[in-house]
């Protein structure tokens, strides 16, 4: 699939990421490389995303379930693909739970807190 907006070259993204304190792996991702077409924008957006990801009161497991549900309901293959690994390796979400996010109301894998956040996503 061809991007609708071209990404900046990987080397440029890594250099900009380094200036911002972002590692090469993160700076090499398409989302960063696309936003980096506008360096001022990427600085602000990544500042906001970092704050949301690191200074919130939501457990990482719940956050990733929310992201996976949003990815599923919006048909975002990119979001689903990017966060599958994060959810399974860093947030303690099993592959079975990720698949169950698609039709979570019928699943017995989720407790009350998880069901509440998944319902909030659907609302």
Identify the meaning behind each predicted range.
Residues 82, 96, 112, 116-119:
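Residues forming well-ordered secondary-structure scaffolds
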Residues 9-10, 67, 86-87, 120-123:
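Short, intrinsically disordered/low-complexity patches at protein termini
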């Amino acid at each position: 699939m061809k991007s609708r907006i071209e990404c900046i070259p990987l080397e440029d993204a890594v250099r900009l990421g380094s200036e911002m304190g972002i590692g090469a792996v993160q700076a090499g991702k398409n989302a960063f490389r696309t936003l980096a077409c506008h360096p001022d924008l990427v600085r602000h957006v990544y500042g906001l995303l970092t704050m949301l990801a690191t200074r919130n009161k939501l457990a990482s497991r719940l956050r990733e379930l929310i992201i996976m549900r949003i990815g599923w309901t919006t048909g975002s293959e990119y979001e689903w693909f990017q966060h599958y690994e994060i959810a399974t390796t860093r947030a303690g979400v099993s592959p079975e739970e990720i698949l169950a996010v698609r039709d979570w109301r019928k699943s017995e894998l989720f407790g009350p807190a998880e069901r509440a956040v998944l319902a909030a996503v659907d609302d």
